[in-house]
């Protein structure tokens, strides 16, 4: 398929998606930003507005500029209605054959609250769970940066870069980053130098605000693409890399405690289940998500297949134990329910050309590679996702598609 044919096919698919928006979502809001964002994360706070039907949420994102334009780490606030919107025939655009502005009532507002100068594009930015005012970021340099965003004005007064801390220990750029949920101030980063660095931002620092790693781990023969603390254990973490390896580590040991190779190409991302101490998932260039059980790492527990291109992000839902999502170069975010996985030997299992039963939703609102996404911690089926064509999207799966006794029971 030529590039022109590919663009036409993408455009056609997007038009079809737009026509079906009212049936698939309770909310879809697209923000066309000036520059693409490689990173996005909801923050944990939520504020009820004066209008009781709305709530205000914050998110972290960044810029990827070109031509010498200043990059920024950004905090934005998003106001979203709490009521399920009604299907409105008046929103049908007969000329374009689509519904417009669905879920974008007067309560849906998106405003930039804080902009912080950043040296180069923001590869990844994540807040510290124990103090969400503290944000770590990565860019195209060796260093990792720590910001307290309460110490920065809403707009920078000049072009000077003013992080609260610089973490110095890598010898190359990177994307992987993970804060500990159980130990305040502890951070892991992965880099193209193949190293994993463990930091304690509360440790002694130099006069110039620099910190060196508490420890460094070498377990990959090429780029270390991602790293993640275990959600429930103090010292357990995992890393993945271009050598196709999944390594499981103990912070107190210098070597991986377990190593597995379950993908046929580079592994880009890793996530631990926040409800189960044994289950984790990895996403790969081979277009699959692998599920793993730490009690038996000799083989994958299951392979999730429905992406058409490499996967860049995977994340378990913070609300439901069996739900996770993944995104990548096929412009899609796929939501999976692993409790729906069928026995591969069963005659009722999905064929290779059908949608597997574990796929419960496909978000097709993007027209370019989905660089990152984030589950909203306060709204169970709401996700923010970003793509390479300057779109940030907030979308909420229709309650009619996911409402069931199972989900209601899990939320009690």
From Swiss-Prot:
Q: Which domain of life is it from?
A: Eukaryota
Keywords carried by this UniProt record: Chromatin regulator, Developmental protein, Nucleus, Repeat, Repressor, Transcription, Transcription regulation, WD repeat
Q: Which GO terms describe its molecular function?
A: histone binding
Q: Which InterPro entries match?
A: G-protein_beta_WD-40_rep, Histone-bd_RBBP4-like_N, WD40/YVTN_repeat-like_dom_sf, WD40_repeat_CS, WD40_repeat_dom_sf, WD40_rpt, WD_repeat_RBAP46/RBAP48/MSI1
Q: Which Pfam families match?
A: CAF1C_H4-bd, WD40
Compartment(s): Nucleus
Q: Which cellular component, as a GO term, is one annotated location?
A: NuRD complex
| SUPFAM superfamilies attached to this UniProt entry | WD40 repeat-like
- Spans of the WD repeats? 117-157, 169-209, 219-259, 262-302, 306-346, 365-405
> What's this protein's family per the entry?
Belongs to the WD repeat RBAP46/RBAP48/MSI1 family.
Oligomer status and interactors: Binds directly to helix 1 of the histone fold of histone H4, a region that is not accessible when H4 is in chromatin. Interacts with zft-11; the interaction is required to suppress the activation of non-neuronal genes in neurons.
- The name this protein carries in UniProt is Probable histone-binding protein rba-1
Q: What is the species of this protein? A: Caenorhabditis elegans
